[in-house]
């Protein structure tokens, strides 16, 4: 039986999907902008 593919790590999670990571690229800022416009409670992880 193979292992589960999801091995949670809060460090990896923040580093790849965190707010600062989003703001560091133009595409990331676009994501945050869209989520704001849509009224999301959480903009990023």
Curated annotation (Swiss-Prot):
Alphabetical UniProt keywords: Ribonucleoprotein, Ribosomal protein
Gene assigned in the entry: rpmH
NCBIfam families referenced in this protein's UniProt entry, alphabetically: rpmH_bact
GO annotation, biological process: translation
Bias (Basic residues) ranges: 32-45
InterPro entries: Ribosomal_bL34
Source organism (scientific name): Syntrophobacter fumaroxidans (strain DSM 10017 / MPOB)
Compositional bias annotation for Polar residues: 1-10
Name this polypeptide is given: Large ribosomal subunit protein bL34
GO molecular-function term, one example from the UniProt record: structural constituent of ribosome
Family named by the database record: Belongs to the bacterial ribosomal protein bL34 family.
Taxonomic lineage of the native organism: Bacteria, Pseudomonadati, Thermodesulfobacteriota, Syntrophobacteria, Syntrophobacterales
Compositionally biased intervals (Basic and acidic residues): 18-31
Pfam families: Ribosomal_L34
GO cellular component: ribonucleoprotein complex; ribosome
PANTHER family tied to this protein: LARGE RIBOSOMAL SUBUNIT PROTEIN BL34M, MITOCHONDRIAL RIBOSOMAL PROTEIN 34 FAMILY MEMBER
Annotated region (Disordered), positions in chain: 1-45
């Amino acid at each position: 039986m193979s292992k589960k593919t999801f091995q949670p790590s809060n460090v990896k999670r923040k580093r790849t999907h965190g707010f600062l990571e989003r703001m560091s690229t133009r595409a990331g800022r676009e994501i945050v902008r869209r989520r704001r416009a849509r009224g999301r409670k959480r903009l990023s992880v």
